[in-house]
């Protein structure tokens, strides 16, 4: 069965006999030859396993170690949970499409759910990076005010607000996208349901959607990025005033990991969402990096340069090993 014949079964007739609407979509996915499908499946399985295991390990470490009680580690736990979920929204469906042609099919409702979940998690991560930058600004530039400003209650409230704003932001985009009429074709030239490739299939005017998407990038994403940049300008200025090189390195070390994460988060989406609507080539690589590779890299980025997290991981692994050894019967 070809993708064309599959797509023909994904439309249903409306009250108007001359008009059909799409009931399912066909995710064309990544471009690869059939003989390489098994290799790509194993590659994505490996990446997904590392992503989920790495992020859940960070989450478990932050939640169980009393030495990681600072707000920055509280927010790192939220980031790890977001990355594990973000990878879960996209990668399993990609892997299903690598196995069978039917694995590339997604229902209209399933597409809406995937789009909502992706933008909910990605938007929340965007706001979380801003909160993390503000946390570092207070810790370095306002150290005396920091314990009062970033107490446990404030951390919980700020994290909750980022999740609430992310959910609202995703709901707006999802409702605007799926209020449109989709009457064919049903081929999404992408590996998951995202706003630009889905809008290309709409049979009605998408001007409002495109304006809202550009406004979202201009106001939400750019606004968060500006706040992050301003925070780090003050941070760098404060770090440069520290007299010892060791003090400067200790103060700025957590910030370098955050800056790396911010760059990996912002650069690929800009390449995706700001390219012309008619352009499909070139979107795949940044999208794969943004949705699949970055969530895998974040645990390494935030642990390799952070001695506290590395020591906490060692304590957790050693404790787990001792418990498993003590529980095993003697030879």
UniProtKB/Swiss-Prot annotation:
Pfam families: 7tm_4. Glycans are attached at residue 18. Coiled coil: none annotated. It is a multi-pass membrane protein. Keywords: Cell membrane, Disulfide bond, G-protein coupled receptor, Glycoprotein, Membrane, Olfaction, Receptor, Sensory transduction, Transducer, Transmembrane, Transmembrane helix. One of its GO terms (biological process) is detection of chemical stimulus involved in sensory perception of smell. Signal peptide: none annotated. Gene3D superfamilies: Rhodopsin 7-helix transmembrane proteins. GO terms for molecular function: G protein-coupled receptor activity; olfactory receptor activity. Disulfide bonds join 111-203. One of its GO terms (cellular component) is plasma membrane. It comes from Homo sapiens (Human). Residues 60-67, 135-153, 232-251, 305-331 are cytoplasmic. It comes from the Eukaryota. Residues 1-38, 89-113, 175-211, 273-283 are extracellular. This is Olfactory receptor 10S1. It is found in: Cell membrane.
């Amino acid at each position: 069965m070809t993708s064309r014949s599959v797509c023909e079964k994904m439309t249903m007739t409306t009250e108007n006999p001359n008009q059909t609407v799409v009931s399912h979509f066909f995710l064309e996915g990544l471009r690869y030859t059939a003989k390489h499908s098994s290799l790509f499946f194993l590659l994505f399985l490996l990446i997904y396993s590392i992503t989920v295991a790495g992020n859940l390990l960070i989450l478990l470490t932050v939640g169980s170690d009393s030495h990681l009680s600072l707000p920055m580690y509280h927010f790192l736990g939220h980031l790890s949970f977001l990355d594990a979920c973000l990878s879960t929204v996209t990668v399993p469906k990609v892997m299903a499409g690598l196995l069978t042609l039917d694995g590339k099919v997604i229902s209209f409702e399933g597409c809406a759910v995937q789009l909502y979940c992706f933008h909910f998690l990605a938007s929340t991560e965007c706001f979380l990076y801003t909160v993390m930058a503000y946390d570092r600004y207070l810790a370095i530039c306002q150290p005396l005010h920091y314990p009062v400003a970033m107490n446990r209650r404030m951390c919980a409230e700020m994290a909750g607000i980022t999740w609430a704003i992310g959910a609202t932001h995703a709901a707006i985009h999802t409702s605007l996208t799926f209020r449109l009429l989709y009457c064919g074709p049903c081929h999404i030239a992408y590996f998951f349901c995202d706003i630009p490739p889905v809008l290309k299939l709409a049979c009605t005017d998408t001007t409002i959607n495109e304006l809202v998407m550009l406004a979202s990038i201009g106001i939400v994403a750019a606004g968060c990025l500006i706040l992050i940049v301003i925070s780090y300008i003050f941070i760098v200025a404060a770090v440069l005033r520290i007299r010892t090189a060791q003090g400067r390195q200790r103060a700025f070390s957590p910030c370098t990991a955050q800056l790396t994460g911010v760059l990996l988060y912002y650069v690929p989406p800009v390449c995706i969402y700001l390219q012309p609507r008619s352009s499909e080539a070139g979107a795949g690589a940044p999208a794969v990096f943004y949705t699949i590779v970055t969530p895998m890299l974040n645990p390494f980025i935030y642990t390799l340069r952070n001695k506290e997290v590395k020591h906490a991981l060692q304590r957790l692994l050693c404790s787990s090993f001792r418990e498993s050894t003590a529980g095993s019967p003697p030879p």
